Design a protein with these regions (language model features):
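Short alpha-helical elements
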Residues: 1-329
Length: 329
């Protein structure tokens, strides 16, 4: 079953409003003054729908506002100006992480999670290696088949069925181990960069990077499930540190694993490639087009939340989880 565009927007709004009322509104501070022209649920719904890249006539927040103003005034009678809409989105960016977590709580079932890093370039072509937008946080890094990129690095934990459970961002030149450290410490409620300590337990063996890292509540809920990782996370010191400090069991493939174990491990981790491919193709995670740090955090959080919601809608309709490209007709 597919959805026409109007039915999709209505379904998305109903789901978002239900989550907002139960998981977000109770945490919102009381505000005085006149009522807002658009409700938070309407703003969040449009901000999430704007991340879709398949079956929709828009490619950005500006595009969906233009579309809503021209074609869907019966669904959204009061449409904010573009600048006001952008401000509301940035102020509510944390709501996207709460939506992501609420959906993950409902959909994530199974025995293990999977973790991997993902480069997010922020500029195309020659501009990729010159300062521009996000010049204070974007850096040249290596990732994605050992290619260089100019942007930021994402570390994500994904459930075995493909549902995103948490993520962290850092400058492109920050090693993946430190981005994972930030993610795990955030999940444990003590965000920071400590790393393994020396034999006396006083000083870190390796000093943490000084580049930008987003210390924000995007890591998701703590879990006792084992996390499968690639071989780059091997090392007894780091694995023991994460287990002791944050209660996280990271399981990289052993070097001397037998062929059958390597085959199972590779198959189990295939969901990582599927997830990042869908985030890129159906939700535009690469080249997010943000001009500021908060704009980048808002868009990344919205894209991951939209991805989880897409899986939820597909399941409600009895469709394959990752059939995003054919959901809207």
């Amino acid at each position: 079953m597919e959805l026409d565009l109007e039915t999709f927007l209505v379904a998305l709004y109903v789901i978002v409003d239900d989550i907002y009322q139960s998981a977000i509104k109770p945490w919102m501070p009381a505000c005085g003054g006149p009522p807002a022209q658009m409700s938070d649920s309407e703003v969040l719904c449009l901000g999430l729908a704007a991340q879709w890249r398949s079956g929709v006539p828009w490619q950005s927040e500006r595009g969906i506002m233009r579309y809503g103003r021209k074609h869907r005034r019966h669904l959204f009678p009061t449409v904010l100006t573009q600048s006001a809409f952008n401000r509301r989105l940035r102020r509510r960016w944390g709501a996207f992480s709460l939506i992501q977590a609420a959906v993950a709580d409902q959909l994530a079932q199974g025995a293990y999670d999977v973790m991997d890093g993902f480069p997010i370039p922020v500029a195309h072509g020659a501009r990729s290696f010159n300062p521009g937008w996000l010049a204070d946080i974007a850096r040249i890094g290596q990732g994605g088949n050992d290619r260089y990129f100019y942007g930021v690095r994402m570390m994500m934990v994904i459930h075995q069925n493909g549902v995103a459970t948490g993520w962290a961002l850092a400058s492109g030149n920050v090693p993946e181990r430190w981005v994972a450290e930030l993610l795990f410490s955030t999940r444990a409620g003590v965000p920071g960069l400590q790393g393994p300590l020396d034999a006396q337990g006083h000083k870190p063996k390796v000093l943490p990077p000084e580049e930008w890292m987003a210390v924000v509540p995007s890591g998701g809920a703590a879990s006792n499930k084992p996390i499968l990782s690639d071989g780059g996370f091997r090392g007894d010191d780091g694995l023991a540190h994460w287990a002791n400090a944050y209660g996280v069991q990271v399981c990289p493939l052993p070097k001397a694993a037998p062929r059958a174990e390597r085959h199972w491990f590779s198959s189990a981790r295939q969901v990582v490639d599927t997830t990042f491919a869908n985030l890129t193709e159906s939700f535009g995670l690469k080249y997010p087009g943000a001009h500021s740090t908060w704009g980048l955090l808002t868009r990344v959080a919205a894209k991951v939340a939209a991805y989880n919601l897409g899986i939820m809608i597909n399941r409600l309709l009895g469709r394959p989880d990752f059939a995003f490209a054919t959901l809207i007709v």
